[in-house]
Curated annotation (Swiss-Prot):
It is found in: Cytoplasm. NCBIfam families: tig. One of its GO terms (cellular component) is cytoplasm. GO terms for molecular function: peptidyl-prolyl cis-trans isomerase activity; protein folding chaperone; ribosome binding. The keyword Ubl conjugation does not apply. This is Trigger factor. It comes from Streptococcus pneumoniae serotype 4 (strain ATCC BAA-334 / TIGR4).
Length: 427
């Protein structure tokens, strides 16, 4: 294999490489054996056409494309490795020569990893806005939240207040004409919940069951239904019932209803205090890690971040997001319809985040390289076992999904993050 690389501009160049006849000939033989099985040529049994007759009738060149498709991926990977390149985006491949009896010549326009000039990344001073201490108010807030979850709705005679639930019928119209989606019957609406467009719920406060209220609202300018956006509407709303939350007493019985593992309210408070302390400690560690890494990134200089890297990160993030939705039974079309957004909107949403994440990844990789971090076979095996446990998979499944190089990369990245974080101090 002959390999050369020519820099064209920052982080871009042309990689030229060859595929030798030593590789081409056996691949052409393999392709021919596969192709001849389906050939019907007069005078020969199906699948028994001799190679010289094939070459005479169709030309050896008829096999070239399939052979190239098979040989190119490994040849490109080998060329990148031999040239010592770190390619960060899909290449633009061009087959420049496929002459009979000659080595094939291919060029690839590639984008390479940008240079990272590291600044300080160890012994950093950082600020975090996360409290580690658990207060009585924290514990009481969590218990109150659980207490409210056990509340029952009880019909009340008095006028509706914020926090109450009303059961209503409503008919919406614009300039006296009803519109699609503007009607509902026996709808339970929590006042103050923000379920309906701004102003709707507020106008029901102070009214009682049996009353009919003309609710006048204006649809937001960015409302998903474009034909309604920015328009004033009237909703004739009849209140059937007003219900108030009735929360259970704050006692030992409540504690047992919330958590069957405790016997008293004091037990529940102690348990919640420990859980909140663990959660706050984890949040504090995450905040320190985030602040330290952000500082290391700010201290570094990246020489011209290629747009292709950002685009690939956006694409990866969007696919990951949509994949998570599909696992929940929501397909992309359904999501875009519900949210009134498009694929382009989603890409734009991830754009800024992708640029930041790409810079962060580059700096952490540069730290790992500068520190000479590596991963032993023992560490790789331990990582595989941990991933298998985390995702409830067999070890063999993880090994099939992730290559040793991918696992080694992840381990070295973790070591770099640990170095940046563990040496940081909080102001």
């Amino acid at each position: 294999m002959s390999v050369s690389f020519e820099n064209k501009e920052t982080n871009r160049g042309v990689l030229t490489f060859t595929i030798s006849q030593d590789q081409i000939k056996p691949e052409l033989d393999r392709v021919f054996k596969s192709v001849k099985k389906s050939l019907n040529v007069p005078g020969f049994r199906k699948g028994h056409l001799p190679r010289p007759i094939f070459d005479q009738k169709f030309g050896e060149e008829a096999l070239y494309q399939d052979a190239m498709n098979a040989l190119l991926p490994n040849a490109y990977e080998a060329a990148v490795k031999e040239a010592g390149l770190e390619v960060v985006a899909q290449p633009k491949i061009d087959v420049t020569s496929m002459e009979k009896g000659q080595d094939w010549v291919i060029t690839a326009e590639v984008v390479t990893k940008p240079e990272v000039k590291l600044g300080d990344y160890k012994n950093l001073e950082v600020s975090v806005d996360v409290e580690k201490e658990v207060t009585d108010a924290d514990v009481e807030e969590r218990i109150e939240r659980e207490r409210n979850n056990l509340a029952e709705l009880v019909i009340k005679e008095a006028a509706a207040e914020n926090g109450d639930t009303v059961v209503i019928d409503f008919v919406g119209s614009i300039d006296g004409v009803e519109f699609d989606g503007g009607k509902g019957e026996n709808f339970s609406l929590g006042l103050g919940s923000g379920q309906f467009i701004p102003g709707f719920e507020d106008q029901l406060v102070g009214h009682s069951a049996g009353e009919t209220v003309d609710v006048i609202v204006t649809f937001p300018e960015d409302y998903q239904a474009e034909d309604l956006a920015g328009k004033e509407a009237k909703f004739v709303t009849t209140i059937h019932e007003v219900k108030a939350k009735e929360v259970p007493a704050l006692d030992d019985e409540l504690a047992k209803d919330i958590d069957e593992e405790v016997e008293t309210l004091a037990d529940l408070k102690e348990k919640y205090s420990k859980e909140l302390a663990a959660a706050k400690e984890e949040a504090y560690k995450d905040a320190v890690e985030g602040a330290a890494i952000d500082t290391a990134v700010e201290n570094a200089e990246i020489v011209e971040l290629p747009e292709e890297m950002i685009h690939e990160e956006v694409h990866r993030s969007v696919n990951e997001f949509l994949g998570n939705l599909q696992r929940q039974g929501i397909n992309p079309d359904m999501y875009f319809q519900i949210t009134g957004t498009t694929q382009e909107d989603l890409h734009n949403q991830y754009q800024a985040e992708a640029e930041s994440r790409t810079k962060t990844n580059l700096v952490i990789e540069a730290v790992a390289k500068a520190e000479g971090f590596d991963a032993s076979e023992e560490e790789i095996q331990k990582e595989v076992e941990q991933l298998a446990a985390d995702y409830n998979m067999e070890v063999a499944q993880v090994q099939n999904l992730l290559s040793a190089d991918m696992l080694k990369h992840d381990i070295t990245i973790k070591k770099a993050v640990e170095l940046i974080t563990s040496t940081a101090t909080v102001k």
